[in-house]
């Protein structure tokens, strides 16, 4: 019998007998475990061989045998739990232990570095599952980072300095304002073993042609092997950077026929998905990666929803005891902000916008927040920390304003905290704030009626590219802000847009109201090298590594 099954049977027997040694019979024990008399004898003999109990059998009708427990079910349960932790079987661990506080304590104690059978394993604690990793769909901050570890694109952007680098394409050139040519590497393999072909690249780009930032791609052809020509309807100075974004990452052309592709995607990147459940995401270094192989062999993201209510503000890679911590932090390139929806009467009303912006000013929100949040929040006066576009101007409450509707996406505890503070402040002015929590997909599409939306944005390097690119690709913003997005996109592609002025106009009209910049934190380990926090609050897994302990 497998060890795990035998352990479960012993724990069940120990619980049924309340851990007490006793005189009993095979028939009575078999009834407790709902098995045959013969199987019960086999179980007892095997458990006795393991040293868990003693079974002193008595022969004869009416004779009772002696059962003596040498091991407690609790001790064996703990051992089983440790085994499940080492095997990263978090689903089974939760089922075995049951108590959430105990599970959390066990997970935290096993965070950080592990070295098993010659492999370096990194364990990370996170507050929610990462179930959708499909490029081109509505991805949140962390899903965007994970997708970059799984997929490759024609180009990539260096997370540390924002510079453009080669990826699947080793060189490229602009033949004319509307014609670009990319030269691709041969011998690139997908995680499921197949070699990448030009048809995969062409299909990946045609798949995203409906997205606003990629709608100007007129044609994609391969004139010669490993050469890709892209023809545009309008010039785009940003095209090489655009093709390094997550929506433009390369998928196998048969991706729609592959089971559960969104949660178990197949790419050509440095890591492949091994497991993705509600309790755990496990990715493993891809040995056939066309670039430098990752130095950390395996990354396990353990999901513990209970930590969502803690304002940790970042990733936890190390538990509270043991090796000394290394903490890295940065103020996010982005902010929480209010978005007024011009589709509703109150959202479009300038007096409402001015007054709400005044009473829900960044300083008011920080003032009414609990101390644990005040340490992580910094008042925002622009979409970026270096910008000071917003001006706090005293405004009178509009006559007849009695209620407002605020909407945000779920699984984000700070949204609830900020909304609660807003509700408290507005109530003091006799305004009722109705709060709606919706899915991220619903939020992204923006088809629900709401006066105001509570949003957050994290912009990646280079900022002069990603800021407009991020805002332009969210349908919600295009619904709420009635400007000529296509004309602005054309100006941006031509390099004719003053991005700071464009954002200042959005803030001045109160279409967007910056609220809070958040401190991003990684609690790491001193032995980890190459850990550089990116603007998404994560770090490039393939570049990190563990230094061996100092020789004695």
Curated annotation (Swiss-Prot):
Annotated GO biological processes are: negative regulation of DNA-templated transcription; peptide transport; positive regulation of DNA-templated transcription
Record's keyword terms, sorted? Activator, DNA-binding, Repressor, Transcription, Transcription regulation
The organism's superkingdom is given as Bacteria
Q: Name one GO molecular function term.
A: peptide transmembrane transporter activity
- HTH marR-type domain segment(s): 1-116
Residue ranges of DNA binding? 26-49
Question: Does the record bear Repressor in its keywords?
Answer: yes
Q: What does this protein do?
A: Activates the small RNA gene sgrS under glucose-phosphate stress conditions as well as yfdZ. Represses its own transcription under both stress and non-stress conditions. Might act as a sensor of the intracellular accumulation of phosphoglucose by binding these molecules in its C-terminal solute-binding domain.
Q: What is this protein called?
A: HTH-type transcriptional regulator SgrR
Annotated source species: Shigella dysenteriae serotype 1 (strain Sd197)
Identify the coding gene. Answer: sgrR
């Amino acid at each position: 019998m497998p060890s795990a099954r035998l352990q479960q049977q012993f724990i069940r027997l120990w619980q049924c007998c309340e851990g007490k040694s006793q005189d009993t019979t095979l028939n009575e024990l078999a009834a407790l475990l709902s098995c045959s008399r013969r199987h019960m004898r086999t179980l007892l003999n095997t458990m006795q061989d393991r040293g868990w109990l003693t079974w002193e059998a008595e022969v004869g009708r009416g004779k009772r045998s002696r059962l003596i427990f040498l091991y407690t079910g609790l001790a064996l349960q703990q051992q089983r739990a440790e085994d499940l932790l080492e095997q990263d079987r978090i689903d089974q661990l939760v089922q075995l232990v049951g108590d959430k506080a105990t599970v959390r304590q066990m997970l935290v104690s096993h965070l950080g570095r592990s070295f098993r059978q010659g492999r370096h394993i990194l364990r990370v604690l996170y507050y929610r599952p990462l179930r959708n990793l499909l490029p081109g769909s509505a991805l949140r901050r962390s899903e965007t980072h994970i997708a970059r570890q799984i997929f490759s694109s024609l180009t990539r952007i260096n997370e540390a300095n924002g510079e453009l680098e080669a990826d699947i394409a080793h060189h490229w050139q602009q033949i004319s304002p509307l014609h670009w040519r990319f030269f691709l590497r041969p011998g690139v393999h997908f995680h499921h073993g197949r070699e990448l072909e030009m048809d995969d690249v062409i299909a990946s780009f045609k798949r995203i042609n409906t997205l606003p930032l990629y709608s100007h791609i007129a044609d994609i052809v391969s004139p010669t092997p490993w050469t890709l020509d892209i023809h545009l309807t309008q010039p785009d100075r940003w095209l090489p950077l655009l093709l390094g974004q997550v929506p433009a990452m390369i998928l196998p052309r048969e991706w729609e026929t592959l089971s559960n592709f969104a949660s178990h995607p197949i790419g050509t990147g440095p890591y492949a998905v091994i497991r993705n459940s509600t309790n755990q995401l496990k990715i493993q270094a891809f040995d056939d990666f066309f670039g430098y192989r990752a130095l950390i062999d395996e990354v396990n993201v353990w999901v513990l929803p209970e930590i969502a209510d803690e304002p940790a503000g970042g990733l936890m890679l190390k538990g509270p005891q043991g090796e000394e911590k290394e903490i890295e932090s940065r103020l996010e390139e982005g902010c929480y902000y209010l978005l007024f929806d011009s589709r509703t009467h109150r959202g479009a009303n300038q007096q409402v916008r001015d007054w709400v912006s005044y009473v829900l000013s960044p300083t008011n929100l920080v003032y009414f927040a609990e101390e644990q949040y005040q340490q992580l929040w910094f008042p925002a006066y622009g979409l970026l920390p270096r910008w000071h576009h917003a001006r706090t101007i005293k405004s009178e409450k509009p006559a007849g304003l009695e209620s407002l509707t605020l909407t945000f996406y779920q699984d984000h505890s700070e949204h609830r905290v900020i909304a609660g503070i807003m509700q408290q402040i507005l109530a003091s002015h006799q305004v009722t704030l109705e709060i709606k929590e919706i899915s991220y997909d619903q939020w992204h599409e923006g088809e629900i009626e709401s006066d105001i939306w509570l949003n957050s944005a994290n912009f990646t390097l280079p900022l002069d590219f990603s800021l407009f690119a991020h805002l332009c690709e969210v349908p919600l913003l295009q619904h709420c802000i009635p400007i000529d997005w296509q004309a602005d996109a054309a100006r941006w592609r031509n390099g004719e847009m003053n991005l700071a002025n464009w954002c200042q106009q959005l803030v001045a009209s109160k279409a967007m109201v910056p609220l809070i910049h958040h401190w991003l934190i990684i609690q790491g380990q001193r032995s980890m090298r190459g850990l550089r926090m990116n603007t998404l609050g994560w770090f490039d897994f393939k570049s990190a590594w563990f230094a061996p302990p100092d020789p004695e």
